[in-house]
Amino acid sequence: MTVDQRTTAKAIMPPVEMPPVQPGRKKRPRRSRDGPTSVAETIKRWAELNNQQELDPQGPKKARKAPAKGSKKGCMKGKGGPENTRCDFRGVRQRTWGKWVAEIREPNQQSRLWLGTFPTAEAAACAYDEAARAMYGPMARTNFGQHHAPAASVQVALAAVKCALPGGGLTASKSRTSTQGASADVQDVLTGGLSACESTTTTINNQSDVVSTLHKPEEVSEISSPLRAPPAVLEDGSNEDKAESVTYDENIVSQQRAPPEAEASNGRGEEVFEPLEPIASLPEDQGDYCFDIDEMLRMMEADPTNEGLWKGDKDGSDAILELGQDEPFYYEGVDPGMLDNLLRSDEPAWLLADPAMFISGGFEDDSQFFEGL
């Protein structure tokens, strides 16, 4: 097939139209941010129209319908964020990632306007109210009254509307009313904040008073008063306890205020309590319940190594253990040399080579062991 034939075939064949990718679905045109179809220009146009109808009562008026009540998010059941089903604000819904969005439909059942994304549902509801007042005028259905919207949400919504309306599309009267409502709400918030601050300050002051009361020297002196001696009456009839308590309290206060470096330099801190009574002042003549300290000291000086003397009859007839005997006492029939060997031996007694010692128990004859039984 030559080149001329190909050219002739292309001229004869009709052009082939490509079918759309998704037949039956219309592509919704996007609104530009700055063009005549933007959200800001649309709200501004409706606000000017409402303003003209209010200021010119004799002019031609177009019938306006009140906005629909809505279907309580019937189409959003099971969709959106976790809190979307519990949200009762008009024109507000939650995204799956937690953000809140606001939308409003133009009057006369026209298309919806996207008002923006907000961090809270209240802020989105306030933005919807501002747009509803601008587009529907006195017939607008709002989420909050003009004096019942949260102050923080009003500020966020006003900032969003100002960004959407760079030219100040709202009328002066509407802006003034919204500003007054916001200022009243802010005043309420400030009043509540001031009252909360006052209550917090009062609580802190009460706590500081309690702490200062606990650290007063008078309270410390009363607590530590049982450690002091009973008050003595002077010759002129005055009480000596006053002077002692003042001195004692000053010592305690100085002890508490003294830095740790001062205590380290002195080697020890000041004595908070009075010195203990000496041993010589202990009660005497208590019968068998007390002991003689002088006698105990004399005994310790006479026998510093606690060996003692063994006194008594050397023939073993008087076998009573008494302090001051000449030699130690042994049981009758027991070999003293064997006991000394047992005590001086390095090996245990059960490892010794003489098993007869365990049988006889150290006695010369078994009859001596069973004699006293």
From Swiss-Prot:
PROSITE patterns: AP2_ERF (PS51032)
InterPro entries, per database record: AP2/ERF_dom (IPR001471), AP2/ERF_dom_sf (IPR036955), DNA-bd_dom_sf (IPR016177)
Entry's induction text: By heat shock, high-salt and drought stresses.
Domain of life of the organism encoding this protein: Eukaryota
Molecular functions per Gene Ontology: DNA binding; DNA-binding transcription factor activity; transcription cis-regulatory region binding
A GO biological-process term: positive regulation of DNA-templated transcription
Record's compositionally biased regions (Basic residues): 61-76
Cellular component, GO, one term: nucleus
CDD domains, per the entry: AP2
Compartment annotation: Nucleus
Keywords: Activator, DNA-binding, Nucleus, Stress response, Transcription, Transcription regulation
Renumbered residue ranges of the record's region Disordered: 1-87, 216-270
SUPFAM superfamilies: DNA-binding domain
Segments of the chain annotated as binding DNA: 88-145
Function: Transcriptional activator that binds specifically to the DNA sequence 5'-[AG]CCGAC-3' of the cis-acting dehydration-responsive element (DRE). Binding to the C-repeat/DRE element mediates high salinity- and dehydration-inducible transcription. Involved in drought and heat-shock stress tolerance.
Record-stated family: Belongs to the AP2/ERF transcription factor family. ERF subfamily.
PANTHER family: DEHYDRATION-RESPONSIVE ELEMENT-BINDING PROTEIN 2C (PTHR31241), DEHYDRATION-RESPONSIVE ELEMENT-BINDING PROTEIN 2D (PTHR31241:SF62)
Protein name (record): Dehydration-responsive element-binding protein 2B
Species per Swiss-Prot/TrEMBL record: Oryza sativa subsp. japonica
Gene: DREB2B
